[in-house]
Amino acid sequence: MEFFNVGKIVNTQGLQGEMRVLSVSDFADERYRKGSQLALFDEKDHFYSEVEIASHRRQKNFDIIKFKGMNHINDIEKFKGFTLKVSQQHLSDLDEGEFYYHQIIGLEVYENDVYIGTIKEILQPGANDVWVVKRQGKKDLLLPFIPPVVLNVDVEANRVDVAIMEGLDDED
């Protein structure tokens, strides 16, 4: 079974079994919805156990979650540093033009059929995601995921076509 990263447990929160999670999930509200099933992996990326979400809220840059049946700090302290993952079977179908991060990371980026680089990371600074493109011999290029910039995404062809707007590439 294939698993995809959702977030990393960075600390406990209070005494009632809540944890601070630094999320890398594309759909945090869906991932941490009450009743959602996630898998815990230890620091060496070994499967530990499946867990069910009991509660979720946002606080600053963290998602605060609680697992069903774990109501005290002593129950969850051992999970610090663990990674939360979702199994492929728990991924929902997306609408046209929506993608999971794992589908985007690794795609090749082209402008006017000229290879630019490969998407290595996705940032969530605000209203729009920003795709980080690793380029050969140049600094990484930050591309906002907006229609004037991202023209076409073809996951099957491993390709993204873009139009780099003036001011986005400070090496030109």
Curated annotation (Swiss-Prot):
Cellular localisation: Cytoplasm
Keywords, sorted A to Z: Chaperone, Cytoplasm, Ribosome biogenesis, rRNA processing
Domain PRC barrel, chain residue ranges per copy: 95-168
One GO molecular-function entry: ribosome binding
The keyword Nucleotidyltransferase appears for this protein: no
Pfam short name (any one): PRC
Record-level GO cellular component terms: cytoplasm; ribosome
One BP term from GO: rRNA processing
Stated role: An accessory protein needed during the final step in the assembly of 30S ribosomal subunit, possibly for assembly of the head region. Essential for efficient processing of 16S rRNA. May be needed both before and after RbfA during the maturation of 16S rRNA. It has affinity for free ribosomal 30S subunits but not for 70S ribosomes.
Quaternary data: Binds ribosomal protein uS19.
Family: Belongs to the RimM family.
Domain notes: The PRC barrel domain binds ribosomal protein uS19.
Name used for this protein in its record: Ribosome maturation factor RimM
Organism from which the protein derives: Streptococcus uberis (strain ATCC BAA-854 / 0140J)
Phylogenetic lineage: Bacteria, Bacillati, Bacillota, Bacilli, Lactobacillales
